[in-house]
Amino acid sequence: MEDVTERFSCSKLLVPKGEPIFVKATWFPTHFHLAVTDGITAWHCHPSEEEVKQRAAQWDLPVSEYLNLSERYLGLQQPGSVYALDDAGDGHKRLSWTFEKEGMTLLWRWKCLLSPDSKKSNVEILDFLMGSNINLSDKVVRENELFEKMKVEAEKCLTQSERIANERLEFESEIYAKAEE
């Protein structure tokens, strides 16, 4: 059985003339899932492997490169990229973003379907953000503790080095004094 690795991202994207949106993504080797919210309403985009393959082929890209570019632009707002969440009818939205490639501005977009339970979807996005924040805070605390321990050890090494240097000077002074006698 093939080991399927998934990665997650969640970003706050600024859309022109509108409130920011949040995009939580789950990235698989051959496709992705998006959950998008404006804080009130939520939408989902779950293209199949075949849909992603077709979209990548339209842009003459291997699926892996298509997914990497999508993750780059949806995982963190990129300077110069224009993001939009436009009406697609029946409560659905179209998420789009621009990017530069070989001097050309390209526009990628995916239709996002209205979530059957926006409250639940919003809670899932907030849970993900809170979990990520807690993990990041824990990591910062651990790294600060490690830094403090290393600082104490470095101070001990410096003290020991100074002591050894002083003992060496005393020893050399004694040897030279005996040699002069």
Task: Go through the PLM ranges and name each one.
Residues 1-137:
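Assembly/interface modules of non-enzymatic eukaryotic complex subunits
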Residues 112-181:
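Intrinsically disordered, low-complexity acidic regions
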